[in-house]
Amino acid sequence: MVQTKRQKAIDLAVVPGKAYGIDEAIKILKTATKAKFIESVDVAIRLGVDVKKSDQQVRGSTLLPAGTGRAVRVAVFVPSGAKAEDALAAGADAVGMDDLAEKMQAGDLNYDVVIATPDAMRVVGKLGTLLGPRGLMPNPKVGTVSQNPGEAVKNAKSGQVRYRADKAGIIHCVIGKVNFDDEALKLNLQALLVDLIKIKPTASKGAYLQKVSLSSTMGPGVMIDQSTLSLK
């Protein structure tokens, strides 16, 4: 692919292995934006964990203070009644039990998040082969199995992100869009890192947040100097 002079200059400006202060890193990301769409801002966090060990797996969710900039479609499995009404009032795009399961089995899977109350999991369990591979299976560790579906829907619609360390011990997550204010992106990143620190496995030894890098959808990765972040 032929690079423009501008893109070459941007790539040269990012020194491999150098950690940049968060403010400078965000400016580099915004300068590097080249797509005709509004790019997402992604973070990759290498953790000091051995995910092969069951007591060092990291999985959770964070409500980003500035949201994600994405419209989120939410389906909720909940028996009819007050909780179902709460979910609808909170903005759920679909609510049901067996009827909702039948629609999903027929191919209606255009959802970003699936939430369920504990008593609805008997229905959701039958959809494991459909929801599991898509990362949609409700799980209490990320707040998608909840006694309060209304609150869970509000969180999902307000910018809650879910994450899980991959086989290499890396968390990948979207923390906003390149058109966000610099401060909003910084606050979102700090909120995510603070929550990750809170769920650090006790068996994890040594440096936990080993490497934090930001990138836009089409831009270069920029390693962050963690001392420029507020993580308390």
Curated annotation (Swiss-Prot):
Belongs to the universal ribosomal protein uL1 family. GO terms for cellular component: cytosolic large ribosomal subunit. CDD domains: Ribosomal_L1 (cd00403). This is Large ribosomal subunit protein uL1. Binds directly to 23S rRNA. The L1 stalk is quite mobile in the ribosome, and is involved in E site tRNA release. Keywords: Repressor, Ribonucleoprotein, Ribosomal protein, RNA-binding, rRNA-binding, Translation regulation, tRNA-binding. Pfam families: Ribosomal_L1 (PF00687). Part of the 50S ribosomal subunit. Gene3D superfamilies: 3.30.190.20, 3.40.50.790. GO terms for molecular function: rRNA binding; structural constituent of ribosome; tRNA binding. The gene is rplA. GO terms for biological process: regulation of translation; translation. The lineage of its organism: Bacteria, Pseudomonadati, Pseudomonadota, Gammaproteobacteria, Lysobacterales. InterPro entries: Ribosom_uL1_bac-type, Ribosomal_uL1, Ribosomal_uL1-like, Ribosomal_uL1/biogenesis, Ribosomal_uL1_3-a/b-sand, Ribosomal_uL1_CS.
